[in-house]
A protein has these predicted regions:
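Short, small/acidic-rich helices and loops at N termini and domain boundaries
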Residues: 358, 838-842
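Charged, surface-exposed helical/loop "interaction arms" that form contiguous linear patches used
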Residues: 344, 354, 358, 368-371, ...
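Amphipathic heptad-repeat alpha-helical coiled-coil/stalk segments that mediate oligomerization
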Residues: 207-213, 261, 276, 367-436, ...
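ATPase nucleotide-binding head domains, primarily ABC-like/P-loop NTPase cores
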Residues: 8, 42-45, 223, 293, ...
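Charged catalytic and DNA/RNA-contacting regions of genome-maintenance
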Residues: 1-324, 333, 337-340, 344-353, ...
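Short flexible coil/turn linkers enriched for glycine and charged/polar residues
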Residues: 25-26, 85-87, 129, 140-142, ...
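Extended, charged coiled-coil "arm/hinge" scaffolds of SMC/Rad50-like chromosome-maintenance ATPases
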Residues: 488, 492-526
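Beta-sheet entry/capping signal
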Residues: 28-31, 37, 88-92, 179, ...
Length: 845
């Protein structure tokens, strides 16, 4: 039975309430609170029971047949919500808004929050070391506006980007946004890519409210376009969270060229935050560098790695602090010990703003504040460029009010210390007196009645009672004044007038204590809410010093050196190492130099398979990134320019989802570098052209090398198996040949992993195949065929074109006119292919 098949006038009041809420939120799974359970009905029940492997049952609701139903305990809701979110669902939490015992008629219920991939705030559901971003895109007619926030921390950023579909998708992927809100004008190709290829939850809405409540976010904002962009996102968040949130920080607008540019492919190829194959954090660069002690520090480290600095003064300020911490190791160790005592202040502030912080959260804030004076002294001694507040008045409030070991729930009492509130103290004295009476009454009754097994107990059904064992029941006399209440297998339970009188006083005090403690706690939490922006500033400073102590710790452990950043374009890395590879291999790492002066823009790298060409290329990129985030680097000396971007084409894997072949992916990534690189960029091309036929691939590789050499001038590492290309050293004055050396003895090959000047003319592919234990007869046959090919081989002319402008002459005017009328930004891949075939036919005619 589906919800649309039901006559709402025939169902019970409770089910009518559910249906009315569900019909307003059709695309959301409703968790409907009934007592100690969340229950789901109709299609929601069917879907949830299937996805979570729950028992599907039925519920009577006034109809002839029971409606589908499943349920979960309310205290375990986060576990089930997380599983549904991972599967791409949104979950609406429908709570009871009044005490069922006090309700007149049907209990009032309503949605209090909609949970989606980008709006998770529960501590158990979030990863400490990663942000959980929700973002939006709006069409500004001439450009796209993008903003994003982590509602668990309150940071909020925005940028305006070209109206290029692939570019904006790449930027969203690079940031790691988990959920997108888009207006209806955003290109369907963008929506399709995000939803279908990258499995990002997308909501289409044009609603934009200009809330006065959020005006503080736009303080000192000069470009008011950003207000519209961000308000689109804030409207969605406010609507789904059913409240205003005061922990959003002042908007940070981003210029896309204010940090080193790296697209999502470059970040993946270099394994900055996860490995290529297993998508794991272990054995990535962040795994090596992360010795942070706080969750905000770990998240900031990830931000640093993905957005290296290009301002020399910022980089050198960080390097100065790292140097100081390495010299002042006692201070550094004291700092590390202190940071270990600091909790996740960013997300604690977020939970306070959300109204979901419990007493344990406030206790974590208090314990973090306690350590701040010591951290402030350390920061002063190392001349750190930021200061922190210590908020002694907030610490005093929490120290005087919150129990040291409070329960998780804020509705069970035992939250507030004695001495904080006079009325509460009076009630606690009354409760204590009542409990003392119970103990005294039990002893007196034993003495009075002679019943040695008599006990006084309590449960929620009968309240306080007198319990007498079965063996002594016959000794209970009428003059005792006991009234029988319950018969058990081994005992009888009674009440007495005196006990019931005291019970009323005790339970009344207990109930009042719980209510008063809850109200006092909420009052304290509201007070803490006024400190949110100051707590966030403290967290920001602590996160940065935490990252820098992590850099110092890693540098000491791994023998890293301070890089020298210059305004020149020379690269001089002596004994460079790939820090992650060095950490995980079971042998001594072979260090290599990278020297590229003003006369050398391109290193053409040849050498055997598996000899280390790719590692050498990645090594330089990793050293550059580490230097520009303010870290020491794995080398004995490193003199580097400031790079504005890194472009890579490393590895070859078909993009099966989008239907793009290895070669197409190669060409797209090469084109990205060619169109966007400057002379201050770093380009890494590994085996470019291998995805197509040999002559095609070699021709393209040479043309690309020439174009970079003549038109861009970027520092480039280009590895190849096309040994014919090594002739280019004699024809391109800024290109230099280097090779990875190997030792060949008695038909066996030993990889030396050492980079040397000059070229090699062998790839040793068959040797590598033998190392992979291919059958010996197969290896022998391959050697025979190789000898045949080597005898037939003719040297290919690598005549250089002086300059390769990216234009061409087409005589067919119809094709040109057709091209002029095409808007590439509005084309889907299929439409583009169709037009390509049409153009081909026109040229043929």
């Amino acid at each position: 039975m589906g919800i649309n098949d039901v006559d709402i006038n025939k169902v019970t009041p409770m089910m009518r309430q559910y249906i009315e809420i569900k019909q307003k939120n059709k695309d959301i799974i409703i968790f409907f609170r009934l007592g100690d359970f969340y229950e789901m009905f109709f299609e929601d029940a069917v879907n949830v029971s299937r996805e979570l492997e729950l028992t599907l049952t039925g519920k009577s609701c006034g109809l002839e047949e029971r409606v589908p139903m499943c349920g979960i305990p309310h205290h375990a809701a986060n576990i089930y919500i997380d599983k549904l979110i991972e599967k791409g669902y949104k979950v609406g939490i429908c709570e009871q808004l009044e005490d069922p015992a006090l309700a007149k008629g049907i209990v009032e219920r309503d949605l209090i929050q909609i949970v989606s991939p980008g709006t998770i705030i529960s501590q158990e559901s979030l990863v400490d070391w990663d942000n959980n971003y929700i973002g939006n895109i709006i069409d500004l007619d001439y450009a796209y506006g993008v903003s994003y926030t982590d509602i668990s921390t309150g940071e909020i950023k925005a940028f305006i980007t070209d109206k290029n579909n692939n570019k904006v998708v790449s930027q969203i992927l690079s940031i790691g946004i988990k959920e997108i809100v888009a207006d209806s004008k955003v290109a369907t190709e963008i929506i399709g890519l995000l939803k279908n290829q990258y499995k990002i939850v997308v909501t289409i809405t044009d609603q934009i409210n200009d809330y006065d409540y959020y005006d503080y976010i736009f303080k000192d904002l000069k470009d008011m376009r950003y207000k519209r962009i961000v308000n689109h996102l804030l409207t969605y968040i406010t609507n789904t969270q059913k409240r205003f949130l005061n922990h959003f920080q002042t908007l940070k607008t981003i210029e896309l060229d204010e940090h080193m540019k790296m697209d999502v492919h470059t970040k993946r190829n270099l394994e900055l935050t996860e490995t290529l194959r297993l998508k794991q954090r272990n054995y990535s660069l962040i795994w090596l560098l992360d010795k942070t002690k706080t969750a905000p520090g770990a998240r900031l480290l990830k931000t640093f790695i993905e957005n290296p600095e290009i301002k020399m003064e910022v980089i050198n300020k960080r390097l100065d602090i790292v140097s100081t911490l390495m010299k002042e190791f006692i201070l550094k160790n004291d700092l590390i010990d202190s940071l270990n005592e600091v909790y996740d202040l960013e997300r604690l502030a977020g939970r306070v703003a959300f109204g979901s912080a419990n007493a344990r959260d406030l206790l974590q804030i208090k314990n973090s504040l306690k350590i701040l004076p010591n951290i402030q002294k350390i920061l002063e001694k190392i001349n750190f460029y930021y200061k922190i507040e210590t908020l002694p008045e907030l610490y005093e409030l929490l120290e005087n009010s919150i129990y040291e070991e409070p329960p998780v729930s804020i509705k069970e009492g035992f939250l507030i210390k004695s001495g904080y509130n006079a009325e509460l103290d009076e009630l606690k004295d009354l409760r204590k007196g009542g409990k003392d009476f119970v103990a005294r009454f039990e002893n007196e009754e034993r003495e009075r009645t002679g019943l040695k097994t008599l006990k006084v107990g309590y449960n929620r059904v009968f309240g306080y009672f007198i319990e007498v064992s079965k063996g002594s029941v016959n000794l209970v006399k009428e003059e005792f004044g006991y009234e029988r209440r319950q018969t058990l297998a081994n005992a009888e339970r009674y009440i007495s007038p005196i006990l019931k009188e005291k019970e009323a006083l005790i339970l009344n005090a207990e109930e009042k204590i719980i209510d008063l403690e809850y109200n006092l706690f909420v009052e304290i939490r509201e007070n803490v809410k006024t400190y949110i922006s100051r707590i966030q500033k403290i967290a920001k400073v602590l996160s940065e010093i935490d990252v820098l102590q992590s850099f110092a710790t890693v540098a000491e452990t791994n023998n890293f050196v301070r890089p020298e950043l210059t305004l020149e374009r020379d690269i001089e890395v002596i004994d460079g190492r790939h820090p992650v590879v060095e950490k995980v291999i079971n042998r001594e790492y072979v260090a290599n130099d990278v020297k590229m002066n003003t006369d050398t823009d391109i290193l053409l790298i040849t050498g055997p398979n598996m000899a280390g060409k790719s590692t050498y290329m990645r090594e330089l990129a990793i050293i550059v990134i580490m230097a520009q985030i303010g870290s020491f680097v794995p080398a004995t000396k490193a003199k580097l320019p400031i790079f504005d971007a890194i472009f890579t084409r490393i590895g070859a894997s078909d993009d099966l989802v989008s239907g793009e072949s290895t070669f197409m992916v190669e060409m797209l990534e090469a084109n990205n570098a060619i169109m966007n690189a400057t002379k201050n960029s770093l380009i890494l091309f590994d085996e470019l052209g291998r995805g197509t036929a040999t002559f095609d691939g070699m021709s393209l590789a040479q043309a690309i090398i020439e174009y970079i050499h003549n038109n861009i001038g970027a520092k480039t590492l280009f590895s190849t198996h096309y040994h014919e290309l090594t002739d280019l050293e004699n024809k391109l004055k800024h290109l230099k040949n280097v090779h990875v050396s190997a030792l060949e003895e008695n038909g066996k090959i030993t990889f030396l992993h050492k980079i040397k000047d000059g070229s090699v003319d062998k790839s040793y592919g068959i040797h590598v195949a033998s190392l992979a234990n291919l059958p010996k007869e197969l290896i022998a046959r391959a050697n025979e065929i190789l000898n045949i090919y080597e005898k037939k081989e003719k040297r290919i002319d690598t005549k250089v074109q002086e300059c390769l402008p990216l234009n061409f002459e087409v005589k067919d005017n119809k094709a040109i006119e057709h091209l002029k009328q095409i808007d590439p930004n509005s084309l889907t891949p299929i439409a583009a292919l169709n037009i390509l075939y049409e153009l081909k036919e026109e040229v043929k005619r």
